[in-house]
A protein has these predicted regions:
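Single conserved hydrophobic/aromatic residue that forms the stacking wall/gate
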Residues: 1-13
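Charged boundary/loop elements
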Residues: 31-33, 37-93, 151-167
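Core structural elements
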Residues: 65, 118-120, 126-128, 368-385
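Conserved polymerase palm-domain catalytic core
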Residues: 108-123, 131, 160-324
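Short, solvent-exposed helix-loop connector elements
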Residues: 134, 242-245, 356-370, 380-393, ...
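A conserved non-catalytic segment of reverse transcriptases
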Residues: 231, 307-372, 376-379
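Short secondary-structure subsegments characteristic of cysteine-rich extracellular domains
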Residues: 388-411
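Extended C-terminal regions of large enzymes
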Residues: 413-479
Length: 479
């Protein structure tokens, strides 16, 4: 537990340099980007009421640096774990460092002398071949302060955010966004402007963001600290790069800042009377006809580029019928006039690639560990895509998955005498075992043989802990 207050760090405070290291940052990002979605219940204000009267926004720094808020922020960062930043400090080392340096660091923030560390660049491949998503990993100390800022600002801005915005917000998620899409389609809005903002996080105009923040936040110290985080720079391949444009994607603060910036677009769409759904920077505007959608696109682009200084990707932005678009991994179709969901083919491909990775016969995993990893992935995947009509898809997918699992065992048994012994242990008739144990048709073909299927039956694989997509899906349907 922390004592009175907390910390933010400068490299000069540490007694030794730490070597940069590369780690997988995806889990931390996934957890921490959703972190600020734990705040008070959201309320609504009128469109023109930009002044918050029930929050004191001129003394926010004291609220941010209050010991209870900082302790809460520390616990969040601690629970999320995640890789270290440029100073190499791990989450496990954080508490000791904070105890030794908290007073000095807090005083630096109060005096306006605190200088955040640069973020560490991590590149994650996108679905589009050759493209990467650039993440910025803050130091664990900077993550604490970003989390502390987020916890104070979130309830203030929740009162301003649109009901049609769903990304990284309290008690809202992708399923809520999809249900709103469904409602719009059922009301006859079957054409959409599928809006793609080109490299949103990398191209945000910092001065515009600061302008928007300053309308609500009257404590200049908080504005200054946020600006310092935006300008902290990045360490990429050991080299420092300035960050005068854009904001790092990966810390606890970035999801909130992105929603604050794009709330300007939400307000403009609402003012013009459009139906829309936005999840983070994924936005769809709904219209009743193609001509109306084309007109909407032509009219909104000048606002996005001329007023918000963001760039619309004209290659990926399009006007289309709802049945032709992909949104949050789903596709849409209408049955008897009602909008329904499918898993988009690209999402199926991505899922199968992950299954191939988890059932790779050469990864050296133990069978129990593999069954555990498969269970974790399949449960999460089905929970997310459970709104889709996919029973037939999952049944065929389960058949393919079981084939891959049987191939793993057939490879592990290697020698004919081992195969003979294993098949006998599984209760197979000795009259057939000898021939099957000496088959030379290749692992994939042999593992699909009817005797092997009978020996490694669906029930046996389930007994050994291997999951199926269908069983998880049926549980969702029952609930």
């Amino acid at each position: 537990e922390m004592t009175s207050s907390l910390v933010g760090s400068e490299m000069c405070i540490r007694d030794r340099d730490r070597q940069l290291h590369i780690e997988d940052y995806l889990q931390m990002v996934s957890a921490e980007q959703k972190e600020y979605a734990e705040v008070s219940a959201h309320q609504r204000i009128t469109e023109n009421n930009d002044i918050i009267t029930d929050f004191q926004t001129d003394n926010l720094m004291e609220q941010i640096l209050h010991k209870d808020n900082l302790n809460k922020a520390y616990k969040k960062v601690k629970s999320n774990k995640g890789a270290g930043g440029v100073d190499g400090m791990s989450v496990d080392e954080l508490l000791g460092f904070l105890k030794d340096n908290q007073e000095q660091l807090i005083q630096q923030i109060k005096d306006g002398k605190y200088k955040p560390n640069p973020v560490r660049r991590v590149e994650i491949p996108k679905e589009t071949k050759g493209e990467v998503r650039k993440l910025g990993v803050p130091t664990v100390v900077d993550r604490v302060f970003q989390q502390a800022i987020t916890q104070v600002l979130t309830p203030i801005y929740e009162k301003q955010f649109s009901e049609d915005s769903f990304g990284f917000r309290p008690n809202r998620g992708a399923h809520d966004a999809l249900k709103q899409c469904q409602t719009n389609v059922n009301d006859g809005y079957v054409y959409v402007v599928d809006m793609d903002l080109e490299k949103f996080f990398d191209t945000v105009c910092q001065s515009k963001l600061i302008e928007v923040l300053s309308r609500t936040i009257k404590d200049g110290r908080v504005i200054s600290l946020i600006h310092k985080y935006l300008n902290a720079g990045v360490i990429s391949r050991g080299m420092f790069e300035k960050t005068e444009v854009g904001m790092p994607q990966g810390g606890p603060l970035s999801p909130l800042l992105s929603n604050i910036m794009l709330n300007e677009l939400d307000k403009e769409l609402t003012r013009r009377g459009h139906r829309f759904v936005r999840y983070a920077d994924d936005c769809m505007i709904f219209c009743k006809s193609r001509k109306s959608a084309e007109r909407t696109l032509n009219n909104i682009v000048p606002y996005i580029e001329g007023k918000l200084f963001l760039k619309v990707n004209r290659t990926k932005t399009c006007v289309a019928h709802i049945s032709k678009v992909k949104y949050l991994g789903y596709s849409f179709y209408r049955y008897k006039g009602i909008c329904r969901f499918r898993v988009h083919p690209k999402s199926v491909t991505k899922m199968k690639n992950k299954i191939r990775e988890l059932t790779d016969r050469h990864n050296g995993w133990g069978n129990e560990y593999r069954a555990l990893k498969l269970t974790q992935f399949i449960r999460g995947w089905v929970n997310y895509f459970g709104m889709a009509d996919m029973k037939g898809l999952l049944q065929s997918n389960d058949k393919w998955l079981r084939h891959r699992i049987r191939a793993i065992y057939w490879k592990q048994w290697k020698k004919p005498k081992t195969k003979y012994r294993k098949l006998k242990e599984l209760g197979m008739n000795e009259d057939f075992i000898q021939w099957h144990a000496n088959m030379r048709q290749g692992i994939w073909n042999c593992s699909n043989n009817r005797l092997v299927q009978f020996a490694l039956s669906n029930e046996k694989l389930r007994e050994w802990g291997y999951p199926t997509f269908t069983e998880f899906y049926l549980k969702i349907c029952e609930n």
